[in-house]
Amino acid sequence: MRKFILFYLFLTFLLTNQALSQTIETLMKDLPPYFSILTTWGLRPEWDENSENIYFLDKMVGNVFKINIKTRQISSVTAGFYHAGIFRVLCLANGDLLLGIGGKTFDPENPEKNRHKLEMYILKKGETKNPISLGEYFDEGPAISRKNMKIAWTIPGQREICMADIKYINGIPQLTNKKIIISYKDSSAYVRLETQDFRPPDDNELIYTHYWGDAKDSFHHSQTFGYNLETGKTTDYTHLPDSYNEVEGIFPDGKFTMIESDRHQPKERRNQYKLDVYRLKLDGSGDAERLADFSTRYPNVLRSDNPVVDRTGKFIALQFGFTAGSGNGQGIFLFDLDMYEQSKKQK
């Protein structure tokens, strides 16, 4: 038994160092043809309103860039103004950007200190300076509608979700009709939630992640939930309590959503954030299909995460995520769903 353990540790060490020593380009040679490289750097991809460009961050606390899908030309978006680091970028229905900025001044000793209290700003489409504050703070990623200017966000502390409309008055964006729609204030101290998407095509359901854990980690377990904005009914879409199932980008028809899950891991290796991306049916069955295998292909080093779906439902942008570091990664990839479906038929 001791020899087996030593062999396993040696093999893990070997694979880890091999993955770390490879470049993104060489790693790509191991992947199926329906993956293609967009960038060898950057993280947290976000499609624009026409699915012509992808916005992304250069690092966890950084600036926003965009890449044109056809030309692959990369340009800076937020280099025109000083800030304390941008953590989130989302594209609104009108093409303006919703930014999550961490404070007024950058602290190099603790760059992520404001990660869970981001100030909400609007940067108008085509502009590179003068973002406008909405006077609100959020934790993790907000949800935005693809058909109107409705947004929802998790209040810092991750115990409540608020919803509002963005209205432009004399060209200045403001929040209106603000209200709390979900509250966990009376729940266990180790229960959290996080917004993700309004469900197309009607936007009458908010898709979010329900977390629970313990004093050590409140996010060990997670399930994909839906909250009906008309009836108040809550639906569990994953039905897998012994694993991690964080919801990510939704498909434009509202029939599927992407999730990050560790359901492929043996039970003793679950709840350690060794995740990969899956396509989950939103029919209540809990059925999910794994679309990438980075966490087992490059164990203890890389995973696939942060998937977002374009407006046609044919392409998914995702990142090479680091196993050690929530949301962090390097390199953005394009997943061709038509090519993937064709490859399944050929098997």
Where does each model-flagged region fall?
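Positively charged n-region of N-terminal signal peptides that target proteins for export
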Residues: M1-F4
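Sequence signature of WD/YWTD-type beta-propeller architectures
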Residues: Q22-K347
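Bacterial Sec-dependent signal peptides at the C-terminal "C-region" and cleavage site
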Residues: L15-T23
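Bacterial N-terminal signal peptides
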Residues: F7-T16
